[in-house]
Amino acid sequence: MVPTSYYVLLSAILFTIGVLGVLLRRNAIVIFMSVELMLNAANLALVAFARERLGVEAQAIVFFVITVAAAEVAVGLALLVSIFRTKRTADVDEVSTLKG
């Protein structure tokens, strides 16, 4: 049986990769994927702790977070496609939707 600390370490590494992707990349799709990686890292940590102590309640929370992440994917991709169609770029530095 794999110890919980390994899952938590993997979760921390994945979350760090996601944070670095958000901070260092300028492509909107890569930033979006990095945010999803951060959500999945948090889910992995929660499941690891639930496996050891919390039980079914934490697994229900993970299911809810996955549902919210799926909705975020749908809305986020729709926004990215819409912005790409109007601006013809996915670079967040070149796209400023607040300008007229």
UniProtKB/Swiss-Prot annotation:
Listed GO MF terms: NADH:ubiquinone reductase (non-electrogenic) activity; quinone binding
Any GO BP annotation: ATP synthesis coupled electron transport
Record bears the keyword Nuclease: no
Localisation per UniProt entry: Cell membrane
Alphabetical UniProt keywords: Cell membrane, Membrane, NAD, Quinone, Translocase, Transmembrane, Transmembrane helix, Transport, Ubiquinone
Main location: membrane
Gene Ontology, cellular component aspect: NADH dehydrogenase complex; plasma membrane
Signal sequence annotation: none
Superkingdom in the source lineage: Bacteria
Catalyzed reaction equations: a quinone + NADH + 5 H(+)(in) = a quinol + NAD(+) + 4 H(+)(out)
Enzyme class: translocase
Transmembrane segments: 4-24, 29-49, 61-81
Listed EC numbers: 7.1.1.-
Protein topology in the membrane: Multi-pass membrane protein
Subunit structure of this chain's protein: NDH-1 is composed of 14 different subunits. Subunits NuoA, H, J, K, L, M, N constitute the membrane sector of the complex.
Function summary: NDH-1 shuttles electrons from NADH, via FMN and iron-sulfur (Fe-S) centers, to quinones in the respiratory chain. The immediate electron acceptor for the enzyme in this species is believed to be ubiquinone. Couples the redox reaction to proton translocation (for every two electrons transferred, four hydrogen ions are translocated across the cytoplasmic membrane), and thus conserves the redox energy in a proton gradient.
Family indicated by similarity: Belongs to the complex I subunit 4L family.
Protein name: NADH-quinone oxidoreductase subunit K
Organism field: Chloroflexus aggregans (strain MD-66 / DSM 9485)
